[in-house]
Amino acid sequence: MSDTQDLLTVGLVSVSDRASSGVYQDQGIPALKDWLSAALKNPVLFETRLIPDEQPQIEATLIELCDSAGCDLVLTTGGTGPAPRDVTPDATVAVADRVMPGFGEQMRQISLRFVPTAILSRQTGVIRGKTLILNLPGQPKSIKETLEGVKDADGNPLVHGIFAAVPYCIDLIGGPYIETDDSVVKAFRPKSAIRPAKA
């Protein structure tokens, strides 16, 4: 990481009734921080929130992270299934300017390689202003698989993770230029969008 790279502000939101009330320790935010710290070359400012499965509170938190905290990227974890209190996608779509359905489609494709119940996930991606918001699974292993994708024994991608598309999406909505460690995840951009290395 160097001072020539753009600062990235990332909101991490864990949505869980039990973790937010202290019944058990949240694992989502630490898993996200660990993965992002390994994957990103940019300096990162994290804004973290641990909240219950309450749609108005999720909406307010997402709005605050996008509009007040100035996050370029917001990642949520938890609350994406079909149960009555799984309302993270509903809150996410409610605050969106535009829905990006390809993110949810790819997340389900990745998870279907492991469990047939992946089709029950309602994960999605949206844009609010200049912020990309993505709903991720709640389990650390699933978070890593979703972001990074699935690789064969030689390290070649079998299924691309969603994060490969995140830097270019953020470019297109006016955010900072994100650089990744290719050994973790290789960001994809068209050649015309690749920034020349700084001297």
Locations of regions flagged by a protein language model:
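Non-catalytic beta/alpha edge segments that cap or flank active sites
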Residues: 1-199
